């Protein structure tokens, strides 16, 4: 995100350098392109800043969702005294509870994104989709609490719940896979909003067609 902000600052600088401030009188926050198009830099900069902040928040959600893949690698494992991992089959209750906590945090963060003002209908739809998929996953874990909500949850049942590339996904992994797909789509849309805002500054001026006087 720091690199993105630096790029935005550079873009604004280039706009100042390339714009023609001659012609009609402009307000302090306005510049004019060579074709006469007037840009309100305050509004455009605000749009870029808001879109970037929203995309950063979505990235946080995506990072949480993807972290479940790393947690799934600990199924049937324990820490050894040398810092590595050793086998400890059938003791996955705490691991499942940790995944539940992560996805619950996703649901809360997505709920906060729903309250963001000024976002597009496309983003609103994709936010709702992520929230719905998170709820579906949490409900699936709740439905399987008999097998999953105990200290000695088996490796097989745990894989079915939190390992999204497992062959059997009947205890939550299928819902987790759907959540991943939904959050990927939301992040792509959010980043698209940033690019669109930047493009408003950098879109090339259309060349005027030469007059054809006979």
From Swiss-Prot:
Entry membrane topology: Lipid-anchor
Location, primary (coarse class): membrane
Signal peptide positions on this chain: 1-18
Keyword hit for Glycoprotein: no
Domain of life: Bacteria
A single cellular component GO annotation: cell outer membrane
InterPro entries cross-referenced by the UniProt entry: Lipoprotein_OspC (IPR001800), OspC-like_sf (IPR036437)
Lipid-bearing positions (N-palmitoyl cysteine): 19
Pfam families according to UniProt: Lipoprotein_6
UniProt region (Disordered), positions on chain: 146-172
Lipid-conjugated positions (S-diacylglycerol cysteine): 19
Subcellular location: Cell outer membrane
Keywords noted in UniProt: Cell outer membrane, Lipoprotein, Membrane, Palmitate, Plasmid, Signal
Function: The Vlp and Vsp proteins are antigenically distinct proteins, only one vlp or vsp gene is transcriptionally active at any one time. Switching between these genes is a mechanism of host immune response evasion.
Additional detail: Genes for both Vlp and Vsp families are on (usually) unnamed linear plasmids in B.hermsii HS1.
Family: Belongs to the variable small protein (Vsp) family.
Protein name, per record: Variable small protein 24
Species per Swiss-Prot/TrEMBL record: Borrelia hermsii
